[in-house]
Amino acid sequence: MKDSHQTIGVFVRPTHYQNPLFKELEQAKEWVLKLLEDEGFESFMIDSLDGAKDERLIEKADAFLCLGGDGTILGALRMTHSYNKPCFGVRIGNLGFLSAVELNGLKDFLQDLKQDRIKLEEHLALEGRIGNTSFYAINEIVIAKKKALGVLDIKAYAGHTPFNTYKGDGLIIATPLGSTAYNLSAHGPIVHALSQSYILTPLCDFSLTQRPLVLGAEFCLNFCTHEDALVVIDGQSTYDLKANQPLYIQKSPTTTKLLQKNSRDYFKVLKEKLLWGESPSKKR
């Protein structure tokens, strides 16, 4: 067993007892902790997704198991991002696009992990800053209207060079890993998850000529709006953006690290999870 993965922190998003998955998650938590012990791993539970509260636990772990869906994985990845440690997802719930394995395949995955038969994928992440507040995004940063009515003007700059003004409901700045999330729903392009780029996809733009734009990750971007707006991180947290206040976005110096099976193939995942390339009439 490699020393680098001896201690596993287990993330579980807190779930209300009325949630249909509550009972399944409660049972799975105990089973996972027992399995980790049986396979020779030290483990502990992190079930608050509160970075300040769990900082010492995060420092203790060598890797993190995320029990749940993609939302749980995204929250854990952001919380652990600055610690430069890998996560892997065990799917319970819906899509599970980022997950490494189903619950019934976890034992085999852990055995492969002990034998170093697991691959480490490193993905581009975004680092954003508003004033003195910095944050990371795994899938996307969205600039959105605060008001239900009207059009939001967003001026976009690459460094100090203005390159576009978006007029609409908002703008998605996505990572390649996040290109299959909100970006895809907004008719943005699928970009291979290991690419080094940003995807800028306008939301309900007022102009017929506006189209999604893919930029190299070497650019430092900044944006400002003509009125107060919201900045949404991975669909899970929000920040206020004041009128004419700059939002700076650049490639994070630390990558998003996911442990995956050696057999995982990106294009196969697209077909299985999103029915990519399938006929609309074909049933799953």
UniProtKB/Swiss-Prot annotation:
Keywords: ATP-binding, Cytoplasm, Kinase, NAD, NADP, Nucleotide-binding, Transferase. It comes from the Bacteria. NAD(+) binds at residues 70-71, 139-140, 167, 169, 177, 180-185, 236. One of its GO terms (cellular component) is cytoplasm. One of its GO terms (biological process) is NADP biosynthetic process. It catalyses: NAD(+) + ATP = ADP + NADP(+) + H(+). Pfam families: NAD_kinase, NAD_kinase_C. It is found in: Cytoplasm. The active site is at 70 (proton acceptor). Gene3D superfamilies: Probable inorganic polyphosphate/atp-NAD kinase, domain 1 (3.40.50.10330), Probable inorganic polyphosphate/atp-NAD kinase, domain 2 (2.60.200.30). Its main location: cytoplasm. Its EC number is 2.7.1.23. SUPFAM superfamilies: NAD kinase/diacylglycerol kinase-like (SSF111331). Its cofactor is a divalent metal cation. GO terms for molecular function: ATP binding; metal ion binding; NAD binding; NAD+ kinase activity. Involved in the regulation of the intracellular balance of NAD and NADP, and is a key enzyme in the biosynthesis of NADP. Catalyzes specifically the phosphorylation on 2'-hydroxyl of the adenosine moiety of NAD to yield NADP. Belongs to the NAD kinase family. This is NAD kinase.
